[in-house]
Amino acid sequence: MKKFLLGLCILGLTNLISAQNDLAMATANDNDITIKTSKIKNELYVMSNSNETKQLAVRIKKLQKIAAAYDISKESIYSNNKSVTYDVVFEANGNYIKAVYDHNGEIIKSEEYYEDVRIPYDLTSQLAKDYPGWSFNKSNCKIFYSKEEASKFTYTIVLKKGNKSKLITR
């Protein structure tokens, strides 16, 4: 009887062994992949604040990339003979970048304003420690870029606690 039960168990397990899925792996030949890259003329503008840009909101990065990729030489107002500057405003959903381009199409300086953006984690945690029990209500971000200086970030945050509100600028 023991041999009979042992035989049934082994026979039952053999069906389970063959029911496993086969694994397949597809690999691509690295030599066949081509990567198209183009150098952005205003790469310094996008990368100038590399420590801060890691924590910037996605929509800030997107609008900055649009401003960096903009080619002033394709516009009808562009003059090849004069060394002048061009003021260009980029707007999207209440956010804007006022950029000043030089004759070569490089951004000399810019003023940026963004409403209701995600606040960087470092600043959020510091404010939570400084103002316990307060909630974040609104936030705005201003960025001032200059080719000669480091970018300056200013966050204006409205904190609320019941009927009270505080305006914090950092």
Regions found by a protein language model. Give the residues of each.
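Short coil turn/linker residues within repeat-based beta-strand modules
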Residues: I40-L44, H103-E106, N163-K164
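Long, charged/polar, surface-exposed segments that mediate recognition or autoinhibition
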Residues: A99-N137
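Gly/Ser-centered flexible loop/linker motifs
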Residues: W134-K138, I143-K147
